[in-house]
Amino acid sequence: MQKPQYIDRITKKKVIEPIFYEKTMLFLYNSKLGKKLSVFLSTHPIFSRIYGWLQRCSWTRRQIRPFMNRYKISEKELTKPVADFTSFNDFFTRKLKPEARPIVGGKEVFITPVDGRYLVYPNVSEFDKFIVKSKAFSLPKLLGDHELTKLYAHGSIVFARLAPFDYHRFHFPCDCLPQKTRCVNGALFSVHPLAVKDNFILFCENKRTVTVLETEQFGNVLYLEVGAMNVGSIVQTFSPNQTYAKGDEKGFFAFGGSTVILLFLPNAIRFDNDLLKNSRMGFETRCLMGQSLGRSQREEI
């Protein structure tokens, strides 16, 4: 079976994505028994809570150094020495030095809010044209709000998928006034490409949070964090109804893989050309937090 590939934004080369717990993932999503087991585990949150508790135990510290070596995670980016982490989950939710993720300036520039693999689509209503095998993607089901669905039905959408070895804090992508976050309860299906490749509706069924960002340059932007298998915890560290600057921390995911989804009103943003090109070819683009995602179309009117 062909392994997932993405395009690295810096090198512009295709990269074969390493599969976290490869044998387990292949069993869960490429066998009949595995698929049934994955549904059972994902719809019973007790398993995710137990797994999360285990990753908070002090003995998991021994996993950190081998994990960093395997996935080439730089210790120089960390705000504290590896020896100071109290558990694997403590390392998983690590903070980085500001210089490790420089922020692109300009109020008209919307930045990538997380380290992850990005897909961008200028029009939500055309989304199915790009997803060949996927089960139906449902915006009403994703948002759980009829009024928001009407507003964003012809807007733009971004998927940013995080792998377990990525930096797992998420940030504000522009200057904004965030409203109170709303939680939409759901299961915790994996968002690994092996799981999602034929089933984008998983994003509409997983536990997720929705925050409206009031912005001057981009109108109201919807910012969603989607939980995944072994990620029962989406932690918001911001205070609603207070202004935040581009690049400020919004929150973090506890252990596992996860996804951020952004929704824009029609004609609010023009995505960068490389992201558009790669998405149209069916390739995710690996970006680092703080890079340019697109520009406000208000500047062009």
Curated annotation (Swiss-Prot):
<keyword id="KW-0472">Membrane</keyword>
<feature type="modified residue" description="Pyruvic acid (Ser); by autocatalysis">
    <location>
        <position position="258"/>
    </location>
</feature>
<feature type="active site" description="Charge relay system; for autoendoproteolytic cleavage activity">
    <location>
        <position position="171"/>
    </location>
</feature>
<dbReference type="GO" id="GO:0006646">
    <property type="term" value="P:phosphatidylethanolamine biosynthetic process"/>
</dbReference>
<feature type="active site" description="Charge relay system; for autoendoproteolytic cleavage activity">
    <location>
        <position position="115"/>
    </location>
</feature>
<keyword id="KW-0443">Lipid metabolism</keyword>
<protein>
    <recommendedName>
        <fullName>Phosphatidylserine decarboxylase proenzyme</fullName>
        <ecNumber>4.1.1.65</ecNumber>
    </recommendedName>
</protein>
<dbReference type="GO" id="GO:0004609">
    <property type="term" value="F:phosphatidylserine decarboxylase activity"/>
</dbReference>
<dbReference type="InterPro" id="IPR033179">
    <property type="entry name" value="PSD_type2_pro"/>
</dbReference>
<keyword id="KW-1208">Phospholipid metabolism</keyword>
<keyword id="KW-0594">Phospholipid biosynthesis</keyword>
<keyword id="KW-0670">Pyruvate</keyword>
<keyword id="KW-1003">Cell membrane</keyword>
<feature type="active site" description="Charge relay system; for autoendoproteolytic cleavage activity">
    <location>
        <position position="258"/>
    </location>
</feature>
<comment type="subunit">
    <text>Heterodimer of a large membrane-associated beta subunit and a small pyruvoyl-containing alpha subunit.</text>
</comment>
<keyword id="KW-0210">Decarboxylase</keyword>
<comment type="function">
    <text>Catalyzes the formation of phosphatidylethanolamine (PtdEtn) from phosphatidylserine (PtdSer).</text>
</comment>
<dbReference type="GO" id="GO:0005886">
    <property type="term" value="C:plasma membrane"/>
</dbReference>
<dbReference type="InterPro" id="IPR003817">
    <property type="entry name" value="PS_Dcarbxylase"/>
</dbReference>
<keyword id="KW-0444">Lipid biosynthesis</keyword>
<comment type="similarity">
    <text>Belongs to the phosphatidylserine decarboxylase family. PSD-B subfamily. Prokaryotic type II sub-subfamily.</text>
</comment>
<keyword id="KW-0456">Lyase</keyword>
<dbReference type="Pfam" id="PF02666">
    <property type="entry name" value="PS_Dcarbxylase"/>
</dbReference>
<dbReference type="InterPro" id="IPR033177">
    <property type="entry name" value="PSD-B"/>
</dbReference>
<keyword id="KW-0865">Zymogen</keyword>
<comment type="pathway">
    <text>Phospholipid metabolism; phosphatidylethanolamine biosynthesis; phosphatidylethanolamine from CDP-diacylglycerol: step 2/2.</text>
</comment>
<feature type="active site" description="Schiff-base intermediate with substrate; via pyruvic acid; for decarboxylase activity">
    <location>
        <position position="258"/>
    </location>
</feature>
<feature type="site" description="Cleavage (non-hydrolytic); by autocatalysis">
    <location>
        <begin position="257"/>
        <end position="258"/>
    </location>
</feature>
